[in-house]
Amino acid sequence: MSEVTQGPRSSVFTTMRFSKERGLFLIEHHIARMIEHATQLRIDATAISMDSIVQLLRQNPPEMVEGLLRIEYTHSLQLRISYRPFSIQNEQVDAVTLPSPIWPARIAGTKHGAWDAYIQARQHAEQKGADLALMVHEYSIVDGDRCSPLILDEDGVIWVSDSNTSVDSITFKAIHDWLLDAGFHIQHGRLNERLVARCVEAVAVGSGVGVLKIDSIDGEPIGDGSSRLFDCCNSCLERLYNGSENWDKVWS
């Protein structure tokens, strides 16, 4: 892993699920986002390709059967990889809030090289006995430390942050249409205090966590105790995980 003290244009990265047997999960989506973010960060994305990544992975296979793969591409055109086990998956969690780092428009919303604020936010949450840090800007939740928050209101509308500091979630995009098919409506807007305080349910989705049901924020209970959105996200993810077309083999 790169030094977290690097500047934002030092590298671009992504994190995805891997299975030694099945390969890489939604890798094409991750590569597309890496290229988009690299371009935004003025990093030459020429070497970000399936072939270059697979070659590096085969030279450095994982010791664990499954887990998370972090792929980083530096401004000096180097690919780096690291593996780690899952920490928390598809569980009920408690969250705390922290101020979101604010970057210039060309940096905001990218998975960039100065990711220390998010790493520290996660560590702060764990020190407080919580599982998740939610990043707040102008009294609204804009992101999670490693996942994207979704807020369900009493009218069945799922609210997603429209802030330019929010990182586009590959996981959310993958289940988006299934959520619509399940009868939810989806709206982008501000996840402000009033919306969150009155919500029916709050969850967070991401490659590293699957889906998390947020039961409390800063010690205050959230939602009415129902789990319709959590259950639906869980079901959608299971369908994705079980679809062979969503995996690209690497080691077998």
For each feature predicted by the language model, list its residue ranges.
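Helix-start/capping segments and mature chain N-termini
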Residues: 1-58, 74-252
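Short secondary-structure junctions
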Residues: 60-67, 182
